[in-house]
């Protein structure tokens, strides 16, 4: 599986540990799609921050956020629908930087 396929798989399973392991030690996830659901932009730096935040996000959500309509354009870009608090948000995730087979920076934008 590509890094993005693994990312989507971890998000669908709610596996915060495996999700964090996809990133470099100082990897970044920047997600502004959450604005469309009335939440603040999510900007996390480092594997530990990613694991801890998603542990809490999956916990408070009662499990993983539903993801559907997944369309991969290449190894760096995927579009999908994610549901936050009952609101379906179309998004694009882009692998901006990779290093040693890990994600160095992942940007997620609303469509």
Where are these regions (language model features)?
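Short, aromatic-enriched amphipathic alpha-helices that serve as compact interaction elements
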Residues: 1-15
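Soluble or luminal CAZymes and related metallo-dependent hydrolases
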Residues: 3, 49, 87
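Short, flexible active-site loop motifs that bind/organize anionic cofactors or intermediates
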Residues: 6-9, 40, 93
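Intrinsically disordered, low-complexity boundary segments flanking structured domains
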Residues: 14-17, 66-68
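A solvent-exposed, acidic/Ser-Thr-rich amphipathic alpha-helical stretch
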Residues: 24-68
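A beta-strand edge to alpha-helix "cap/lid" segment located at domain peripheries
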Residues: 55-111
């Amino acid at each position: 599986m590509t890094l993005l396929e693994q990312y989507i798989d971890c998000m669908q399973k709610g596996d915060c540990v495996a999700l964090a392991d996809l990133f470099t030690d100082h990897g970044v996830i920047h997600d502004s799609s959450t604005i469309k659901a009335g939440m603040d932009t999510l900007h996390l730096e480092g594997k530990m921050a990613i694991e801890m935040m998603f542990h809490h996000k999956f916990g408070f959500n009662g499990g993983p956020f539903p993801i559907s309509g997944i369309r991969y354009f290449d190894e760096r870009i995927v579009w999908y629908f994610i549901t936050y608090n009952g609101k379906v948000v179309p998004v694009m995730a882009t692998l901006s930087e990779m290093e040693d087979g890990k994600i160095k920076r992942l940007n997620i934008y609303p469509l």
